[in-house]
Amino acid sequence: MANCFGEEVDIFKLDTMSRYVGKEKKREDLAREASRLSNEDGKNDKATKYVRDLKAWYGKGVTTLCLIYNQTGDTLRYVDTVDWFGYIGQTPYPTEIGNGQWASFLHVKRSGVSSGSMAGIVYRGKDKDGRERDFMLGWSSPWGAFYRNKAYCEVGNVGSFSSRWDDLYRLVSNADYTWNAKDNGRSSVHASIGVPSSSLFIAYVETPFGP
């Protein structure tokens, strides 16, 4: 995908590292190296520049500059989304985010409407034990100086978010600048958003790993 940045951290990449040569590679190992290499070759910087360039092209108006980093040890695949306010900008949500890749996209307000950018997106991946899990990420960049930005995230069973959008709207609306979600030590998500209007929303989808 054009809006995914970085070389995928896969088994072939681990084979080039002395720590893993001749050894069995586990999902935990892939997650560890994805975490360690989060800005390899400046990929985080490139993803950030990309979404800032999208914002510059879009111009004035409330937006959310979204970055997602995959350090689960497996591929994240797009499942579903909802736009409570606004819509996806010039580039689409990536259908897949490889392990060790940054996804970068812009969510924008509707022109001529006194509302901001507020949406939720679901990606599907695997946890530490190889079970499929759904990861929900939500953000709110309101229109108007009297409202605060919000970041939210959850880990759930496959398909568990599709019937909960009304509930998730309430949860995102009452979230904070940072949010953490854990799944019994098998997976986790961390999401954050800046304070100013049109801030970066940054989410890390993670599989836990040892030293």
PLM region spans:
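Intrinsically disordered, low-complexity segments enriched in small/polar residues
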Residues: 1-211
